[in-house]
Amino acid sequence: MCYAIPGKIESIQEKTVVVDYFGEKRKAHNELEGLSVGDYIYAQGGFAIQKIPLDEAKSILAVWKETFFELQEVDLQLSRLDLNPGAVSGEFLKILDKAAEGRELSRRELLVLIKEKDKTALKLLFKTANFLRQKQHKNSCCVHGIIEISNYCHSACSFCGISGENKNITRYRMSQEEILEAAKVAIQEHGFKTLVLQSGQDCGYSIEELAQIIRQIKTNWPALIFISFGEVGLDNLKILYDAGARGLLLRFETSNPELYQQVNPGKELASRIAHLKKAYELGYLIITGGLIGLPGQSQEDLLNDILLAKELHAEMYSFGPFISHPQTPLANHPSALAETVLKVIALARIIDVVQAKILVTTALETLDPESRREALLSGANSVMLNVTPLKYRPLYNLYPWRAHESES
């Protein structure tokens, strides 16, 4: 649930509240004290995060009421599905028809979809995914703000510009005061209800320091907090959860163990999976996925990546393209194609129709300025906007020419 408008509590049962949005009923987990039926709240990611005064809620809803339904109608028009056969093969159409009905596809059928190259057929695939997105989620779109607090990293990932092996970039580490000020600006001035705190695998912050930052944000401002600090250790996941973090953004990059070791020297896929499983057990919302376009990666690998994300109970799927960075061992490997990323997004929607929120990554927007719109019309329904202080953004140099680097 990602509506950034107030909703009215219809019922409360233990830690679960049912919230009404202009007639739509959605559930949220409640950790706030003193809520009653009839109260108005903001909820994000399935969590109640703030109670707001009645007059303020009604004022906001009065502004949004007409627009809310207008936007739903526009979205409905854009998601209409017409599987016109044209020059597309009969088998491909049968598979899409089965998907549009919400029936589970076999592995063989999914491979037919992901291996398709015909432009007309792919347009139908993307339309089918968008139809399913609208049918299950309407025009709900998650918008998260991300603060990149440090570009220090002791890992040596061969695809990443902030790898510890890259000696040619300027490193930075935001102070606690800077992080809190950035969070304040994002929440109070820009209205974000969900924040992602991200860094490289940085030993410069202790777990106690990170926990203190999270506690202070939660104490001062209403927001759902995701962490993205790499593998912090299984015990430390609980410390950060107890401090108030409720989401984890941690990609497994690839479901292929051999490929994982090739691009993450000295690392094991099993360790990454263990972190994701432990986080889910603790109650974290999971954002995970893979990197598309790695050397030696097959279509079967990509399908396995989507299936692994589902197995790991992903609340949000994050699949982004490999973009070559001149200061990495993979500098000469070609960047992924935007079309391949759109195929993965569409298949993720088809595979996890009901639950999945699917992210449009900044890396995809870097490949193609039109890709945010195309991805949102291909099954995606989530975006992350950079709210890192402008002076630090160019230094978080995961890949060159990153989109939105200078936008305020």
Please identify what each model-predicted range represents.
Residues G7-I9:
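Conserved hydrophobic positions within beta-strands
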Residues G164-L180, A186-E208, I213-L276, L285-I292, ...:
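Core AdoMet radical
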Residues G45-K51, D55:
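Short, charged beta-turn/beta-strand-edge "cap" motif at the junction between a beta-strand
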Residues G102, A129, C157, L250, ...:
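Conserved, mostly hydrophobic/aromatic
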Residues D39-Y40:
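Structural motif
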Residues G233-L240, P295-A309, T366-L377:
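Catalytic cores of alpha/beta
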Residues F126-N166, R171-Q198:
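N-terminal pre-triad scaffold of radical SAM enzymes
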Residues A4-I5, T16-K27, L35-S36, L61, ...:
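Auxiliary Fe-S-binding modules of radical SAM enzymes
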